[in-house]
Amino acid sequence: ATGELYKPEDLNVINFNDVGTAMLQDAVWVTDSWISQDGNDAIAEKFLRATFRGWMFCRDNLDACVQHVLNAGPTLGESHMRWQLNEVNALIWPSPNGIGVMDQGLYDQTVNVAIEGGVLTAAPDAGAVRTDLAAAALEGIDGDTTGAGFSKISVELNPGGE
């Protein structure tokens, strides 16, 4: 009925990781012309380090992180923000190689799925992807960059996300 939340038994969830069609999606993109300019490697590294620290903070301080978002005046309420952060955290953590370090096997799978699906006609050139900046950003971080002990919490999603 209208206004009722869906329950897990109402859904058929397909985990694309289980069927070999998962694709990497979230990334930081820059143009080759920008990153090749003097000093921009350092800017990118600092940006990644700050981003990683932010996600580590949100992993370890869910309530405070949700409150930061609520203070910014989102259109959705607290339970939605809490649920969303819990789900995003589960996508990031654990990160066995460290947050932001791309898994080469998953990258290769992403390329293969994109080629098979007609999104790409050929694999990107070897220089299209860089992982050295994420690795350098991790070197400057104190704290748990792998989140090995992370586990999702139970979040009650209220009608309308309130």
Where would I find each of the regions flagged by the language model?
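Secondary-structure end/capping motifs
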Residues: 36-121
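Helix N-cap / beta->alpha transition motif
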Residues: 15, 31, 103, 129-135
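Intrinsically disordered, low-complexity coil segments
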Residues: 8, 36-41, 126, 146
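Conserved C-terminal helix/tail region of periplasmic/extracytoplasmic solute-binding proteins
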Residues: 108-162
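A structural motif
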Residues: 16-26
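A bilobed periplasmic-binding-protein/Venus flytrap-type ligand-binding module shared by bacterial periplasmic
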Residues: 24-42
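Glycine-rich, flexible loop/turn motifs
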Residues: 24, 30-31, 95-98, 125
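Ligand-binding "clamshell"
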Residues: 1-16
